[in-house]
């Protein structure tokens, strides 16, 4: 009878250790903080920033072409390159998002 009691106690201890280990291995769910921007908000802000950069570049180029004082060719070229780089980066992000969407849609359910 003593062996049966020890066996039961051992099984209870093993189950307790198992549930304890399972509770520790579960990843904690990350919740979005209140007030934190969503992905769509951040993406929209990035697109707006690229648009603003292109507008500034266009305005500087127009001012330089009209011969307005205070507008330097180097400023125009730097603004143009900033607009170009930001647009290329946005295009690459879009391509990666489209590719990720297509990969997800092709996954078997």
UniProtKB/Swiss-Prot annotation:
Keywords: Bacterial flagellum. GO terms for cellular component: bacterial-type flagellum basal body. It comes from the Bacteria. It is found in: Bacterial flagellum basal body. GO terms for molecular function: cytoskeletal motor activity; structural molecule activity. Belongs to the FliE family. This is Flagellar hook-basal body complex protein FliE. It comes from Stutzerimonas stutzeri (strain A1501).
